């Protein structure tokens, strides 16, 4: 029987670190690429569940700036999987009224992948349900570096007075501009680190770590995280 969330506060924005695809495959004597494929299936199911539960923003760490350091074969397989997954995701998004947004530096991808990303965003931009955000070629430090460069150029050109720069100004230059910061960050596979993910945005985010490997993540795992979130006393640096 599925867990009951009656009376619970549903976090507006949930961020996910999808860890454990490779270990999931290794445990079953399968190549790592099979773990990534199964992980994509879990992403689809999680998008549908999040939309149904009333979560407004779901952000997943799809491919980090550091992932380029993996073997050429694995990176190539991930790019092929990304191409395939974008086609499937468009169908899932349209069926569930989901708006898709990509964050990260897309300039390193092949042109057909960039065009696929643009198509996903363009054809779902008017959907009014869940906003599904995928971080691709993304790193928190890289995001902040790119934001600072743009901000510095605007200051140098006179378009921005450096004395007026606030935290909100900096946030407006980030990839996530216009989005609320995550309320809840879930990391699978039991690892206790951020892995260069949303470093600015998670300043006051509640963390939930589960030993579950990402391909095994399901609706009850998500609900367990929401239940744990409801037991937290969010102070945002203050005292209650």
What are these model-predicted stretches?
Residues 1-240:
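Flexible, compositionally biased loop and terminal segments
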